[in-house]
Amino acid sequence: MTRQIIPSSEFASLFLQARPLIDVRAPIEFTKGAFPSAINLPLMKDSEREKVGTCYKQQGQESAIKLGHALVSGTVKEQRIAAWRKAIEANPSSYLYCFRGGLRSQLSQQWIKEAGFDIPYIQGGYKALRTFLIQILESSAALNSMLILSGRTGSGKTDFLQLRDEAVDLEQLANHRGSSFGKNLDPQPSQINFENQLAIAVLQHQTKHHRHLLLEDESFLIGRSALPKAFYNSMQHADIVLLEEDDEQRLQRLLFDYVDNKLASFVSRLGDEAGLKAFGDYLNASLNGIKKRLGGKFLQELLDSVARALAHQISQNDTSLHLDWISQLLTRYYDPMYDYQLSQKQQRVLFKGDHASMHAWLDELRK
C-alpha cells in the first residue's frame, strides 16, 4: 500500500531525485514560488480560493469548507480530477502538496484515491519544503566551504565554471550574466524560485563531498535576482582564486557574448529585421543602464561607437567594428572598477593563473 504522507526526513532525497510534484495550490501561489519538478494542477483557481478565504474570515472554517465543496463540484471537480489522473499516469511516482499539507492536500488525495490512484502528500506542504531549502542555504556546510572565482570581465569565468564539478553557476540559475549586458531574452525566475533552485544545486553539490563550493564572484544582485544575505555575506569573506586571460582573448570572448551570440538569439526569436532592431535597442539600453557610472560624455562616445558598428554590420555583414566600443568599455570602465575592487580583497587571494593552470591547481586541491 502506498504511504499516505511523506515526512521531512525524505525531503533531501525528494529534491535530489527531482521527484515529480503536483502542486494543488492556486495559480497565484504557484507563480510566486514553487519547485523545479512541480506542476501546478490546483484544487481551486484563484477566484475560488479568494471566495473561500473571504468566507473563512467572515463565517469560519466550516462554512468555508462547504463553500469550497460547492465551488469545486460537478463538472469542475471532474475536470480537476482528470488533470490529476493525466499527470499521475505520466509520472506514477508523483507526490502532491498544498501550502501547509492540510485540507487541500488531504481532499485532493482523497479524490485521487477515489479515481483509482494512491499517491502521498508532503507533510507540512510547500511551507515545509521551502523551510528545508532555506536551511540548506544557511547551513555551515554551505557557508564555510566557499571558494570564489574572480577575474576581469571577459576572462571566461562562466565557461571555466561549467567545466568544474565542484562549481555552482549562479548566473545560470538567475538566467542573467551579471553585468549590464547580462539580460537574456527569457525572463529571470521569481526571487523564491531562484533561491529554491540555488538551494537544490547546493544540496546536489554536498552529495559529491567536494572540499570547496566554487562560485563566481558576484554582486548581491544578479540582474534582479538577489543572493540570500547569509550566503552572500559568506561569499564576501571566502578565499579567492583569480582567473587571468590576455586582453585579446577577452575582447574576442566579449564580442561573441555581447554581439554575435546575442544577435543570433534575437534573430532566432524575432526574425532578421525585428531581431536586429531589438539587438540594437538591447545594446543601447545596456549602456544606458550604467550611465551614472560612465558619465554623460563617455556614454555618448560609446553610443556613437555602437551606432557606427551597427551601421557597418548592416552594410558589410561584419560585427568586428563592435570591438571599438567593447575595448573602450573594458579599459575605461570595467577594468578600473575591477582593479579597485580587487585592491580591497587582495589578502583573500590564494592563487592566480590562466585557465590551464587554474584547472591544475584546483585538481590538486581536490586530492
Curated annotation (Swiss-Prot):
This is tRNA 2-selenouridine synthase. It comes from Shewanella denitrificans (strain OS217 / ATCC BAA-1090 / DSM 15013). Transmembrane segments: none annotated. CDD domains: RHOD_YbbB (cd01520). GO terms for molecular function: transferase activity, transferring alkyl or aryl (other than methyl) groups; tRNA 2-selenouridine synthase activity. Monomer. The lineage of its organism: Bacteria, Pseudomonadati, Pseudomonadota, Gammaproteobacteria, Alteromonadales. Keywords: Selenium, Transferase. It is an enzyme of class 2 (transferase). One of its GO terms (biological process) is tRNA wobble uridine modification. The active site is at C98 (s-selanylcysteine intermediate). Gene3D superfamilies: Rhodanese-like domain. It holds the Pfam family Rhodanese.
